């Protein structure tokens, strides 16, 4: 719960099941695991061979709402590897993939990227509504106009980083989401996310856009189409175990390596419920997953799978950033779903 815990006591005979992630490996040496991944990548040449001296390299990182990824532990390794390939720090920049979220403070840049990286390379914030900072690169087959951050498009090579977990609309997080919505324009994001709605107004979410589902998922496929337009040269994504420790780091082709990581996620998170319960008490795992109610939606989604119809869900969310994102909070002013 936030940066701490909440304790509850329940009669043992009333507890149907305590659901945690399946047991999995824990990486003890994150630096060595990162080097192993980027030097023996999936579907790609090693990172040192993907870039060449003279390249301007942009690295996309997830924002503070995804700090569970622990980017600060593997990002310095990526930058050091680029140095070994002949790319100096002055030819590298980091772009924080806010999507529609607010900009970072300096302290949050340090928390996400590490103080070492914050002191070594330029860090920029993405603003989805800054039209002058965006470039149109095409329209997807589903009619989504792709506006992408100019800095990333101006880079010779783009590396995307992040973490993979279950996502209630896109099937899984990570991978292509670093580009869309990460560094996309607001118009692009709104059009893409609308694909998660059912065709009939008021019918709620599309059943094709659901946790763990990527085949036939229009939201996911639209994201992939936009990411392919940018065509990042490399990906590094983390997979975390139930305790929040690194279980695996995948690297390589922006789609193939990510897809391999989703299999690890299912091995850890694919826990079978014994039955549906009258009451489900759920936590997303504390900060930053409970930083606001919007991020908390991932808790409601998974908890709902274990809940009987008309049951009671108790979501444990600290929400220190309760007013973010503003567009989500503003939606509560409506008195109906139409």
Question: Where are the regions a protein language model picked out?
Answer:
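N-terminal amphipathic/basic leader segments beginning at the initiator methionine
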Residues: 1-36
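Glycine-rich phosphate/diphosphate-binding loops that line cofactor/substrate pockets in enzymes
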Residues: 42-60, 86-89, 230, 271-277, ...
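Short glycine-rich or small-residue beta-strand-to-loop segments that form or flank ligand, phosphate
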Residues: 56-68, 93-100, 281-283
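Histidine-anchored nucleotide/phosphate-binding helix
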Residues: 68-87, 296-307
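Short internal beta-strands
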Residues: 89-99, 237, 312-318
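An acidic, phosphate/nucleotide-engaging active-site surface
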Residues: 103-173
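Membrane-embedded hairpin module used as a gating/binding unit in multi-pass transport
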Residues: 204-287
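C-terminal catalytic subdomain
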Residues: 290-338
């Amino acid at each position: 719960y936030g940066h701490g815990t909440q304790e509850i006591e329940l009669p043992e005979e009333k507890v149907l099941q305590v659901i945690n992630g399946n047991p999995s490996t824990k990486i003890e040496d994150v630096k060595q695991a990162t080097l192993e991944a980027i030097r023996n990548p999936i579907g790609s040449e090693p990172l040192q061979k993907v870039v060449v001296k003279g390249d301007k390299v942009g690295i996309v990182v997830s924002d503070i709402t995804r700090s569970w990824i622990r980017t600060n532990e593997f990002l310095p390794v990526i930058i050091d590897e680029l140095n070994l390939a002949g790319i100096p720090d002055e030819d590298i920049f980091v772009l924080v993939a806010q999507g529609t979220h607010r900009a970072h403070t300096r302290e949050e840049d340090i928390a996400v990227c590490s103080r070492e990286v914050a002191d070594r390379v330029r860090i920029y914030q993405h603003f989805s509504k800054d039209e002058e900072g965006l470039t149109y690169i095409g329209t997807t087959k589903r009619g989504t106009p792709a506006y992408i951050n100019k800095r990333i498009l101006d880079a010779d090579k783009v590396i995307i980083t992040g973490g993979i977990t279950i996502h209630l609309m896109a099937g899984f997080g990570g991978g292509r989401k670093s580009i869309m919505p990460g560094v996309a324009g607001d118009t692009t994001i709104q059009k893409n996310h609308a694909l998660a709605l059912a065709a009939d107004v008021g019918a709620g979410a599309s059943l094709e856009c659901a946790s763990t589902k990527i085949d036939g998922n229009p939201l996911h496929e639209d994201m992939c189409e936009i990411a392919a337009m940018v065509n990042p040269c490399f990906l590094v994504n983390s997979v975390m175990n139930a305790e929040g420790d690194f279980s695996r780091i995948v690297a390589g082709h922006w789609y193939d390596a990510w897809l391999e990581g989703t299999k690890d996620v299912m091995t850890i998170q694919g826990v079978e419920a014994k039955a549906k319960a009258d009451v489900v008490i759920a936590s997303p795992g504390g900060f930053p997953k409970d930083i606001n109610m919007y991020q908390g939606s991932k808790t409601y989604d998974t908890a709902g799978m274990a809940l009987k119809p008309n049951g009671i869900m108790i979501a444990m969310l600290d929400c220190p950033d309760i007013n973010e994102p503003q567009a989500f909070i503003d939606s509560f002013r409506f008195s109906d779903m139409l």
